[in-house]
From Swiss-Prot:
Functional note: Component of the ribosome, a large ribonucleoprotein complex responsible for the synthesis of proteins in the cell. The small ribosomal subunit (SSU) binds messenger RNAs (mRNAs) and translates the encoded message by selecting cognate aminoacyl-transfer RNA (tRNA) molecules. The large subunit (LSU) contains the ribosomal catalytic site termed the peptidyl transferase center (PTC), which catalyzes the formation of peptide bonds, thereby polymerizing the amino acids delivered by tRNAs into a polypeptide chain.
Subcellular location: Cytoplasm; Nucleus, Nucleolus
Statement: the UniProt record of this protein carries the keyword Membrane: no
Pfam families per UniProt: Ribosomal_L18_c (PF14204), Ribosomal_L5e (PF17144)
Any one GO BP annotation for this protein: ribosomal large subunit assembly
Record lineage: Eukaryota, Metazoa, Chordata, Craniata, Vertebrata
Glycyl lysine isopeptide (Lys-Gly) (interchain with G-Cter in SUMO2) crosslink residues: 220
Name used for this protein in its record: Large ribosomal subunit protein uL18
Modified sites of kind Phosphoserine: 185, 272
Main subcellular location of this protein, as a coarse class: cytoplasm
Protein family: Belongs to the universal ribosomal protein uL18 family.
SUPFAM superfamilies given in the database record: Translational machinery components
Length: 297
């Protein structure tokens, strides 16, 4: 079929239908969302869970959600800004932090449903492929599907770091090793050791060592927070190992105490009737005193 020019006449504008708001804003890929949300018709009221991963400039957000007509219901959430509690105070948006956030989400969710002792996941991090399988006589493994949003799902993306953390934490998420760091598209082989290095922050540590030797000023500028918190390249692996153990030990979210805010009043409050009468009496008395002084003088 040849090129057909769109004639923008009166009928075109009269029948024009705008796209969904979140599509107009460039926030939602409805082609992907439809496939992530719609459940099999023979499963009736069973929700289809999604593991939502979003990476911002300063944070990594991981959520487990399911769709309802009223809107998405969030079952559990974990954030990279919670990691300082577990000993990771710097680099909260790198691949290693994404793994920790995914692990925290998985352990928190399973703890909430009382399944954390049944599905321990992969305790020893080796970067290799791991899949959670349901145990006979126990509740089935919690299954969900990765929702990467509008992120480019290229090999080594941080979204897959969060996915790997959640899988190692005990969630059943369908995936392959093709998008993990360490996969070679030419030889079609996966190097688990390269992936493990990324999970343990060794790629960052290697770059830190390189900058320390080559450009001291660039190192001080780029890794100022690492220097401030006394984090050296040799400490990185141990820091993440301790963080993984701490997350497994206590993944429960602690609510912050509510701050009591004293309300300030910027305008004058209304006067009662008694106050108004008293004010009038004071003004009268003041006026009469002024009249008397004027008469005396």
């Amino acid at each position: 079929m040849g090129f057909v020019k769109v004639v923008k006449n009166k009928a075109y504008f009269k029948r024009y239908q705008v796209r969904f708001r979140r599509r107009r804003e460039g926030k939602t890929d409805y082609y992907a969302r439809k496939r992530l949300v719609i459940q099999d018709k023979n499963k009736y009221n069973t929700p289809k869970y999604r593991m939502i991963v979003r990476v911002t400039n300063r944070d990594i957000i991981c959520q487990i959600a399911y769709a309802r007509i009223e809107g998405d219901m969030i079952v559990c959430a974990a954030y990279a800004h919670e990691l300082p509690k577990y000993g990771v105070k710097v680099g909260l948006t790198n691949y290693a932090a994404a793994y920790c956030t995914g692990l925290l989400l998985a352990r928190r969710l399973l703890n909430r449903f009382g399944m954390d002792k049944i599905y321990e996941g992969q305790v020893e991090v080796n970067g290799d492929e791991y899949n959670v399988e349901s145990i006979d006589g126990q509740p089935g493994a919690f299954t969900c599907y990765l929702d990467a949003g509008l992120a480019r799902t290229t090999t080594g993306n941080k979204v897959f770091g969060a996915l790997k953390g959640a899988v190692d934490g005990g969630l059943s998420i369908p995936h392959s090793t093709k998008r993990f760091p360490g996969y070679d598209s030419e030889s079609k082989e996966f190097n688990a050791e390269v992936h493990r290095k990324h999970i343990m922050g060794q790629n960052v540590a290697d770059y830190m060592r390189y900058l320390m030797e080559e450009d001291e000023d660039a190192y001080k500028k780029q890794f100022s927070q690492y220097i401030k918190n006394n984090v050296t390249p040799d400490m990185m692996e141990e820091m993440y190992k301790k963080a993984h153990a701490a997350i497994r030990e206590n993944p429960v979210y602690e609510k912050k105490p509510k701050r009591e805010v004293k309300k300030k009043r910027w305008n004058r409050p209304k006067m009662s009737l008694a106050q108004k009468k008293d004010r009038v009496a004071q003004k009268k008395a003041s006026f009469l005193r002024a009249q008397e002084r004027a008469a005396e003088s």
